[in-house]
Amino acid sequence: MSTQEPQKSLLGSLNSNATSHLGLATNQSEPWCLYVSIPDGLFLSLGLVSLVENVLVVIAITKNRNLHSPMYYFICCLALSDLMVSVSIVLETTIILLLEAGILVARVALVQQLDNLIDVLICGSMVSSLCFLGIIAIDRYISIFYALRYHSIVTLPRARRAVVGIWMVSIVSSTLFITYYKHTAVLLCLVTFFLAMLALMAILYAHMFTRACQHAQGIAQLHKRRRSIRQGFCLKGAATLTILLGIFFLCWGPFFLHLLLIVLCPQHPTCSCIFKNFNLFLLLIVLSSTVDPLIYAFRSQELRMTLKEVLLCSW
């Protein structure tokens, strides 16, 4: 953590330490290079918003027994993953601000250990977030294409085993990543994992969208409704699909592009320019943790009603 230019080192190895180990030409300066400086206050504000949102989601699902189903378990775990991202960002930003102000004084070794701990926490939450986004897509796919068998396929014991497995994989992978961040194979594994999740979500949601349009067409023909109604439904579905996948790609894509470029062109001036915007890529991931509750949780009327009761009781 630098006091001159605080690094939100989601895997600080990638932003500062790894640049020297991997030979990244981060000191090169080009007049055309676009660098976006991210204020600490923006990290802190967005992290706090995400923190509040995801805490509310976890409380609502925990409180309402009607929400104790596999689907909401996955949504709750996604909220916990995003919550870990928020806590990590808020904690690291607060420590940086306290160090800069001279309020907090700590040895370099202690700061580095804390930074590594936060890096593991953020990396683990990133992996788990991607996993739960993928498993939510699978759950929705099964609920549509295997509706009659859904409750026999997606059972609570299976859901719990999947949740435990994802958390264990996230912990192990984050520890290995921080330990072996110098090896390009580790970076390529992470990029491949992201592309696999992106492909999985795109295929499943596109198939669900196609089935929904076919279903709408059948209903329209059955009730002799106008063609424009079916087209309107399909356009609405296409917009929803575009927003869902678009937000996922825009928020997560730049960070994994950063990892890929570290492997492909570590010393190229254009890549060096992109490396300088690491904090912007991290901010987009925090933005994703802020948007996820709006997409996956708050659209549920049952959850919104529970949340309303919780807020009214708290007052």
UniProtKB/Swiss-Prot annotation:
Keywords: Cell membrane, G-protein coupled receptor, Glycoprotein, Lipoprotein, Membrane, Palmitate, Receptor, Transducer, Transmembrane, Transmembrane helix. It is found in: Cell membrane. This is Melanocyte-stimulating hormone receptor. Residues 1-35, 92-116, 182-189, 265-277 are extracellular. A lipid is attached at residue 313 (S-palmitoyl cysteine). The keyword Cell membrane applies. Interacts with MGRN1, but does not undergo MGRN1-mediated ubiquitination; this interaction competes with GNAS-binding and thus inhibits agonist-induced cAMP production. Interacts with OPN3; the interaction results in a decrease in MC1R-mediated cAMP signaling and ultimately a decrease in melanin production in melanocytes. The keyword Cytoplasm does not apply. Residues 62-70, 139-161, 210-238, 299-315 are cytoplasmic. Glycans are attached at residues 17, 27. It is a multi-pass membrane protein. Pfam families: 7tm_1. Belongs to the G-protein coupled receptor 1 family.
